[in-house]
């Protein structure tokens, strides 16, 4: 089953991206290096649940 998750910047705390994840295949939390527009640099973004 696919669930919608947000990607939250670890440095500034903003949720900059949203994506879908297959919770059956990917059981651990996503952690990706993405661009943060507030800091204007690439930072690590961790998965957070979005309100549906």
UniProtKB/Swiss-Prot annotation:
GO molecular function: structural constituent of ribosome
Gene Ontology annotations for the cellular component aspect, listed alphabetically: cytoplasm; ribonucleoprotein complex; ribosome
The keyword tRNA-binding appears for this protein: no
Pfam families: Ribosomal_L33
Source domain of life: Bacteria
GO biological process, one term: translation
Ribonucleoprotein found in the keyword field: yes
InterPro entries reported in the protein's UniProt record: Ribosomal_bL33, Ribosomal_bL33_CS, Ribosomal_bL33_sf, Ribosomal_zn-bd
Alphabetically ordered keywords of this record: Ribonucleoprotein, Ribosomal protein
Family membership noted in the UniProt record: Belongs to the bacterial ribosomal protein bL33 family.
Protein's UniProt name: Large ribosomal subunit protein bL33
Gene this chain is encoded by: rpmG
């Amino acid at each position: 089953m696919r669930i919608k998750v947000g990607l939250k910047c670890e440095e500034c705390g903003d949720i900059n991206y949203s994506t879908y994840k297959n919770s059956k295949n990917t059981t651990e939390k996503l952690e990706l290096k993405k661009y943060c527009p507030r800091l204007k640099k690439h930072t690590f973004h961790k998965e957070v649940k979005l309100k549906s």
